[in-house]
Amino acid sequence: MKLQVGEKITFERTFTKEDVVLFTEVSKDEGIHHVTPDEQGRFVVQGLLTSTLPTKVGGDHNVLARKMDFEFLRPVFSGDTIRCDVTIEQFEPDEKNRTKIIAMFTCKNQLEKEVMKGSFSGIIL
């Protein structure tokens, strides 16, 4: 599927306690807020785990990332469902006759509160 400027791609995921535990093991990001539940039994999801949402969309379209900017606006907890909307902003050819891509994204939780936003650029393989 060929992407177009202005196109919006959406991906949604619910983060589980198991996701946080596995990411803690792999990343060694063992901050107390990731390994100790809050009073509601929730764990804070690592920011880099949350940031896999826009990278999933890039991966689906064979984007080799060159630059990624993230702004983490509020915490994501285990049990939260996060929707990531990626909007294609620009395409341009590069010096090797490949296509550069620039995209913006925003991620909201199940309450429609923005939890993360940013942009990425790269090359479509």
What are these regions (language model features)?
Residues 10-14, 71, 121-123:
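Generic structural detector for well-ordered beta-strands
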